Amino acid sequence: MSASSSSALPPLVPALYRWKSTGSSGRQVQRRCVGAEAIVGLEEKNRRALYDLYIATSLRNIAPASTLLTLQNLKEMFELALLDARFEHPECACTVSWDDEVPAIITYESPESNESARDWARGCIHVQPTAKSALDLWSEMEEGRAAANDNTPSKSIELFLLSDVSTDSTPIPQDATVEILFHSNHLFWDGIGCRKFVGDLFRLVGSYIGRSDSREMKKIQWGQEIKNLSPPVVDSLKLDINTLGSEFDDKCTEYTSALVANYKSRGMKFQPGLALPRCVIHKLSADESIAIVKAVKTRLGPGFTISHLTQAAIVLALLDHLKPNDLSDDEVFISPTSVDGRRWLREDIASNFYAMCQTAAVVRIENLKSIAVSHKDEKELQVRALESACRNIKKSYRQWLENPFLQALGLRVHNFEASYLHAKPIPFEGEANPLFISDGINERFIPHEIKQTATGENVLSVESIDFVVNQSLPYLAIRLDSWRDASTLNIIYNDANYTEAEVQKYLQSIVEFMLAFRL
């Protein structure tokens, strides 16, 4: 499969991706996946959870002494909050199926009664009295799935509540930790939608804290929530895709050509195979993060961000790792990347759009030979190389993000990519470029505290947030986000392809280049 012309890219036909009522009850709707959904919904991979999302949160009990928290009553409170959230965002209860087409089918079925809805919520929330962390549980779950050869698609959302107590009815001491692992099937959400939903749950659960009737659920008019499903993204764009012409076709071809070229480009050498998803994490302190941001603004200007610097550091660390002696004067780094597509949706839809909404851009850094530096070089030489790379990166994003049709482009090229990966599940040949995604500031979606709604008192403090995605393709996926002014870098990888020591060393190199940029 090639991307030599726009003829390789079938046109977008909105009617193919709209919700349709199925069955005679009027309680079930379905639609076909489109765009990035089609990639993460590929049957072989989705059945094995190979793109699943996890958000690991660590909370501290800061409730007043009069508020008793146990794993069991937290479970009951989160069940009720989940029911409220389901009414507003039914994506959390969607399911997946497949037929003879590449894109999967998403189905939503409204519960028949409040009792069946409560049974669904009970099955989504689990508790464990344990000293394990949420990330420990992630590893354990993936190891168990692999050992059992489980091919059951993951639910749209599940919660696992953990605390180091004797039983699920043991009071959780003040200042003790409650870890919550949110597990999502990526088909139904992107990272932003998932974070928004977690934030909603943290706000909604406050309504049930301290209530004597917290086990009682309110009556919900099930069936009415179907109208709250995120509308088809193809019908939510600011523009009419039927008006798109040759400029759109040319840009689609430019992206798919870059995508295919990326599969064959210079990158990290990997061992073939598929084993378990793993993650290494580096948390910069708030002081380090603030100093880096200040340096970026001072050296480069107010339009630059820590994300530009991180992408630059990733490329410098790659060159330092490879130490190529055959770089030509005109060799470039090209990497497709993922971008939040909500800015291209209509304003009345964008802020409340929880389903997958990712589009595509291409980062291009010119003249790699001029930025091939090492940590042993003078700081000023490293800084100049980082500045040069940052300017190339910002220019790349500007050239792509200024296109009014970029979300439509993402839908079309990701449809192509899904078919490409369906035909060739491992498109890389011995080497793979790292992929960078900036997730931004978590406070945009998730509150610092869970409050008791009736009193306004803080009950649980959200101390940390870690976001991981199961990795199956043999590249290193590097993510950046922040919480309470402190930035976190993590690398997600598959341990068939790389050793933990290799990945740790590469992550440390990225961090060192970023820290070298400080004033």
UniProtKB/Swiss-Prot annotation:
Record keywords: Transferase
EC category name: transferase
Descriptive protein name: Trichothecene 15-O-acetyltransferase TRI3
An example Gene Ontology biological process: mycotoxin biosynthetic process
Pathway(s) served: Sesquiterpene biosynthesis; trichothecene biosynthesis
Record's keyword annotation contains Transferase: yes
UniProt-listed InterPro entries: CAT-like_dom_sf (IPR023213), Tri3/Sat12/Sat16/Mac1 (IPR009992)
Miscellaneous comment in the UniProt entry for this protein: Trichothecenes are sesquiterpenoid toxins that act by inhibiting protein biosynthesis.
Record note on disruption phenotype: Leads to the accumulation of deacetylated calonectrins.
Organism from which the protein derives: Fusarium sporotrichioides
Family: Belongs to the trichothecene O-acetyltransferase family.
Function field: 15-O-acetyltransferase; part of the core gene cluster that mediates the biosynthesis of trichothecenes, a very large family of chemically related bicyclic sesquiterpene compounds acting as mycotoxins, including T2-toxin. The biosynthesis of trichothecenes begins with the cyclization of farnesyl diphosphate to trichodiene and is catalyzed by the trichodiene synthase TRI5. Trichodiene undergoes a series of oxygenations catalyzed by the cytochrome P450 monooxygenase TRI4.
Upregulating conditions: Expression is positively regulated by the trichothecene cluster-specific transcription activator TRI10.
Enzyme Commission number(s) from the entry: 2.3.2.-
GO molecular function annotations of the record: acetyltransferase activity
Binding positions (15-deacetylcalonectrin): H414
Domain of life: Eukaryota
